[in-house]
Amino acid sequence: MSLSHLYRDGEGRIDDDDDERENFEITDWDLQNEFNPNRQRHWQTKEEATYGVWAERDSDDERPSFGGKRARDYSAPVNFISAGLKKGAAEEAELEDSDDEERPVKQDDFPKDFGPRKLKTGGNFKPSQKGFAGGTKSFMDFGSWERHTKGIGQKLLQKMGYVPGRGLGKNAQGIINPIEAKQRKGKGAVGAYGSERTTQSMQDFPVVDSEEEAEEEFQKELSQWRKDPSGSKKKPKYSYKTVEELKAKGRISKKLTAPQKELSQVKVIDMTGREQKVYYSYSQISHKHNVPDDGLPLQSQQLPQSGKEAKAPGFALPELEHNLQLLIDLTEQEIIQNDRQLQYERDMVVNLFHELEKMTEVLDHEERVISNLSKVLEMVEECERRMQPDCSNPLTLDECARIFETLQDKYYEEYRMSDRVDLAVAIVYPLMKEYFKEWDPLKDCTYGTEIISKWKSLLENDQLLSHGGQDLSADAFHRLIWEVWMPFVRNIVTQWQPRNCDPMVDFLDSWVHIIPVWILDNILDQLIFPKLQKEVENWNPLTDTVPIHSWIHPWLPLMQARLEPLYSPIRSKLSSALQKWHPSDSSAKLILQPWKDVFTPGSWEAFMVKNIVPKLGMCLGELVINPHQQHMDAFYWVIDWEGMISVSSLVGLLEKHFFPKWLQVLCSWLSNSPNYEEITKWYLGWKSMFSDQVLAHPSVKDKFNEALDIMNRAVSSNVGAYMQPGARENIAYLTHTERRKDFQYEAMQERREAENMAQRGIGVAASSVPMNFKDLIETKAEEHNIVFMPVIGKRHEGKQLYTFGRIVIYIDRGVVFVQGEKTWVPTSLQSLIDMAK
């Protein structure tokens, strides 16, 4: 039978002498620590087995290490264990419990860290080593060696800026007086004889309770009414909450966050008791009573507080605790609710105060508006009274304008808010009709321009720059022009003859910057253009003595592209008239020349090729070249059209009908013993008949060079019996001179092209300089010969309006907006140029 159980301690561990054997019996320690996952198995030493609970433990021995067990100290003296049997763990626990209740507290019961540590000595411990264990050596004379030196430390400090009597540091923030020490009265622990703070410490650091002291005091006062199971009397400490703390708590927990709201709806199953309980929020768990389960033995309800003993629970009344806690919670909620109500009332007072200030301002504004409206009403009633037929002092147009100026200057807001259209219709329109009653626009085209300009600034709505009849109800000035001024214009246009265009053009030029754009468009499209179209249809170029351009071209600045539909019938009628035309009749050039810049280049060239060039070719084909008797009329008739037809068309006529006959005559002349001086003059004479632009053409240049080559071959071939003296030299000189002129002309042309390229490069470099979008549009308008100018007094949403040809535009943040039928449409610059052409 094994006797290992005799050496087992109360915790079920085996002594170090038999560490290779272990008993698997279940002890009380195993039952108590069954559910303790952090339990540590402490192997009992020989000293613990000998002395039991009175064994002295060194803190160094209990320090955890990486090894499974502590290494044996073979330098320690040998100790012997007396024979005998150890008591069981249960008996030792009972003895310890009985001793704890009766025995007084001794110094050995305190942890060994609070008392002097005993030094265990053995037989082999040297006596010389015992002096280090009893205590520390006195250091009263420490630093006495300084008085035998030169004081180098003090000198070094003074070199670094130290001033005697002041603290160390950059700002002298160090302490001056050394820290005072206070000797403890006895050998007790810290705080056993009262406060140990010195007078200097109390002055520098006033007494303030730490958080740990406050927590200990709170735990004592909290459990004052309960009896301690251990039997010792403790002073309870209560927790107090101020009203401010409750208010702060109420402000923080006023609104639940989203996760808290979600957790408040979570279903919780409590399986900690004998029965399964279901809660529908985590808050219900906090209100659960701490009542022990019925039917369980008292021992199973008590949880051990330590590994060796279990502390009995105190006297508990969960129902009373719940009621008290409920009363406390209700009181806290009432305080929090009252605080919230008070804050709400204060906020309401502030809000009402601001509302009162705002309403006071609104009331003052309304009073001013009422006062101004009353004055405006008086002025309007005065105008209405003077508009009556039986009034002795009738209202004039100038006086009415002054009244409206007063309304606009002094009562601007009321004037803009009022219905100006109805006011103008009732007062201004009758006076305006009376003013223009005897007006004849063709005789006095500037009549009424000043008065209408004044009323334009008074009545026109800047926010509604309308250009269509649908906006008449929103703009008083547009309605005034349409209903009062426009009937006189319609009446006079119906009586106007289109061939007498100057009075009508002057009239519209005088009013173009005053009347709205859409009204001007209506006059040109609906009144003027139909009259011109009808007159063009009745025009006959063979019988009419008045040229058509004399009464069509004056309309170009106003109508521009609107006249495009008239050009096709005009070209058709001119083409019919030129069927029997001969180049000897110069009247055709006089009729066609004004239309060269009006027609597009393509249509003009097509018209010339179809109707003029064939006639000139026939005339040039009839030309007879005779050096002895030359008739130049036919040649002059053709050359006279040089500016009207293109250079390529003229050169084509010369190549086909002139140069073959001219070279043939030259060859015949050279083959009959000619006079080379006369041939030279004849050559230079014909060449002088052409302009530089024609001579610069490569085909013409080749023909004249061919004539020079023929002349050189004639003088160098010795044809004939007689050769004129100096003829060869003269022809050679002529050839050299002509070639030099051609070379100089080509060099001059190249120089001009280089200069033009340089100018274009300068222009491109200048154009690379940042400019605004308006400057770019202006540059493009100049390049394409399009009129670009601002419309005086016209704005749309605060943006200046411009006329780009016949199109009305405005520019907003680098975007061009073109007036459409009802709205403004953004467009590109190239599309704008195409529309303007």
UniProtKB/Swiss-Prot annotation:
Motif (Nuclear localization signal): 700-705
PROSITE patterns, alphabetized: G_PATCH
Record-annotated G-patch domain positions: 149-195
Superkingdom of origin: Eukaryota
Protein keywords: Biomineralization, Cytoplasm, mRNA processing, mRNA splicing, Nucleus, Phosphoprotein, Spliceosome
Location of this chain's protein in the cell: Cytoplasm; Nucleus
InterPro entries found in the cross-reference section: G_patch_dom (IPR000467), GCFC_dom (IPR022783), STIP/TFIP11_N (IPR022159), TFP11 (IPR024933), TFP11/STIP/Ntr1 (IPR045211)
Glycoprotein keyword on record: no
Its job: Involved in pre-mRNA splicing, specifically in spliceosome disassembly during late-stage splicing events. Intron turnover seems to proceed through reactions in two lariat-intron associated complexes termed Intron Large (IL) and Intron Small (IS). In cooperation with DHX15 seems to mediate the transition of the U2, U5 and U6 snRNP-containing IL complex to the snRNP-free IS complex leading to efficient debranching and turnover of excised introns. May play a role in the differentiation of ameloblasts and odontoblasts or in the forming of the enamel extracellular matrix.
This protein's name: Tuftelin-interacting protein 11
Species whose genome carries this gene: Macaca mulatta (Rhesus macaque)
Lineage: Eukaryota, Metazoa, Chordata, Craniata, Vertebrata
